[in-house]
């Protein structure tokens, strides 16, 4: 197993053990005056006007993927979005089972929806504070226009939203040895590994 599986995979069976962590952030639903702040069982807001819908979790089982240092996708500002109807991976591993040096690692995957330019097909920079800031105007066009001018990239004035994801490799929150994963946690009938997605 040590050849194909990172130490963290077995020794960090869950993350955010003590404090809930945000797992979803949908900017597209923000700005609604007709919705009230709703909180989850941990006391975290599930909806706030200036941020939109959010979800939180605690003691979460990681998601797993092949990872090799130096092999990852990282979205760069201005990079074209090839298909706005598909989930855009902003940061994540690109290794597969065929990469000899890759191992299966645990990840927190942060998902949500972000603003993008529907004509130029790239993510938008958005100013949040200040006179034209979104949190003052709740006007995506104004706030994006100001921020995009500062970024040096053209802005068409057409704002839409795309679902995004970011993979964050988990290295901390190691559990005691007695709480680490055992064989059936992965290989049992209800094991946590998605073997087909991992290439098996």
Sequence positions of predicted segments:
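C-type cytochrome heme-c attachment and multiheme electron-transfer modules
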Residues: 1-200
């Amino acid at each position: 197993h040590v050849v194909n599986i990172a130490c963290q995979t077995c020794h960090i069976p869950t993350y955010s053990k003590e404090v809930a962590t945000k797992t979803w952030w949908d900017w597209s639903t923000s700005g609604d005056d007709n919705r009230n702040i709703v909180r989850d069982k941990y006391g975290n807001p599930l909806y706030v006007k200036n941020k939109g819908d959010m979800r939180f979790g605690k003691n979460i089982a990681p998601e797993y993927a092949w990872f090799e240092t130096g092999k990852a996708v990282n979205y760069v500002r201005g990079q074209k979005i090839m298909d706005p109807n598909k989930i855009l991976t902003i940061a994540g591993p690109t290794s597969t089972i065929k990469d000899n040096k890759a191992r299966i690692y645990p990840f927190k995957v942060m998902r949500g929806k972000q603003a993008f330019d529907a004509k130029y097909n790239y993510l938008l920079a958005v100013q949040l504070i200040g006179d034209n800031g979104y949190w003052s105007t709740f006007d995506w066009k104004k706030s994006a226009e100001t921020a995009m001018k500062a970024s040096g990239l053209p802005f068409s004035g057409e704002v839409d939203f795309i679902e995004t994801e970011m993979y964050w490799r988990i290295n901390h929150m190691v559990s005691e040895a007695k709480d680490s994963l055992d064989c059936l946690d992965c290989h049992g009938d209800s094991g946590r590994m998605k073997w087909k997605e991992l290439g098996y």
